[in-house]
Curated annotation (Swiss-Prot):
Name the UniProt record assigns to this protein: 4-hydroxy-tetrahydrodipicolinate synthase
Keyword Protein biosynthesis in annotation: no
Documented EC number(s): 4.3.3.7
GO CC, one annotated term: cytosol
Catalytic residues in the record: 134, 162
Alphabetical list of Pfam families matching this protein: DHDPS (PF00701)
Phylogenetic lineage: Bacteria, Pseudomonadati, Pseudomonadota, Alphaproteobacteria, Rickettsiales
Gene of this entry: dapA
Swiss-Prot/TrEMBL catalytic activity: L-aspartate 4-semialdehyde + pyruvate = (2S,4S)-4-hydroxy-2,3,4,5-tetrahydrodipicolinate + H2O + H(+)
NCBIfam families: dapA
Length: 301
């Protein structure tokens, strides 16, 4: 498996009573597919996986796989700070038919680099599914070394890394990782720089709201149209900044509510966007013409 392109870190729709909105989720996945993305990543940070019980987690993963129907890749979040729990989740996504499992570096425990390696090796050896390593020190309080990333990447079924430490690291990782391992940016603001340094794609939050724009950035870079890509990257960066103006995914869900994709509901301890945050998000969506485009699309249906 070679991972290339834009993969949406999928938001999870909730109803007003905060139960899963399965109909909205299926519709959202279909819209993502029609917008040209390469894959979806359900049950990650943006999907509020920390607030889903195991039954809900299984429902979201199954529904994404069933809706995708092989048209795009499904890389299901399966990480935890507990190795046995991570193995259980990885075995589930394997049995459900996911294309790969996204495994985050264990958080809260703050293990050593050797502990992180042994965690990934245990998950790898207990399963038979391709694995994408997720390095996000902003949330785990651990930034594992390049050498440890290399050791993990040498495990046979590790096929990618989602790295959120900046585009500067991509070239260094590219030089030491096996060819089979894709380097995926975890930051929309630096996605273009990551591509230019040898990155294979992006696991994107912004593509929840502007999937066509995120795909266009990837396409323009692939075609060598760097000046045009820089213009698109500037727009995506502005959108990315406002989608993190308050704790994510509250701004993303509010943006999607304006676009008619899902309610703005989030589960505690997250709260819905403040009025000032709502104004900021709406202003950026209007500046980028995303609301008008969405209304025009609905009028054609």
């Amino acid at each position: 498996m070679k991972l290339n392109g834009v993969f949406t870190a999928l938001a999870t729709p909730f109803r007003d009573d905060l139960s899963l909105d399965e109909r909205a989720l299926a519709s959202f996945v279909d819209w993502q597919i029609s917008s040209g993305i390469s894959g979806i990543v359900p049950c990650g940070t943006t999907g509020e996986s920390a607030t889903l019980n195991f039954e809900e987690y299984c429902t979201v993963v199954r529904l994404c796989i069933e809706t995708a129907r092989g048209r795009i890749l499904v890389i299901a979040g399966a990480g935890s700070h507990c190795t046995t729990e991570t193995i259980s989740r990885a075995l589930f996504v394997q049995s459900a038919g996911a294309d790969a499992a996204l495994i985050v570096v264990p958080y809260y425990n703050r293990p050593s680099d050797e502990g992180v390696y042994q965690h990934f090796r245990a998950v790898h050896d207990a399963t038979n599914i391709p694995i994408v390593l997720y390095n996000v020190p902003q949330r785990t309080a651990i930034d594992i070394s390049n050498d440890t990333i290399r050791r993990i990447a040498e495990l046979p079924r590790v096929v990618g890394i989602k790295d959120c430490t900046g585009a500067e690291r991509v070239a260094a990782l590219k030089a030491i990782l096996p060819e089979k391992v894709a380097i995926l940016s975890g930051e929309d603001e630096t996605a273009l720089a990551s591509y230019m340094n040898g990155g294979s794609g992006c696991i994107s939050v912004v593509s929840n709201v502007a999937p066509k724009m995120a795909v266009e950035l990837y396409r323009l870079h692939a075609l060598g149209k760097i000046n045009m890509a820089k213009q698109v990257s500037g727009n995506l960066a502005a959108l990315s900044r406002v989608l993190f103006i308050e704790p994510s995914p509250s701004p993303t869900k509010y943006a999607l509510s304006l676009m008619g994709k899902m309610r703005p509901k989030v589960r505690l301890p997250l709260v819905e966007l403040t009025s000032s945050g709502q104004t900021a998000v709406k202003n950026v969506l209007e500046t980028l013409d995303l609301l008008r485009q969405q209304k025009a699309m609905h009028s054609q249906l």
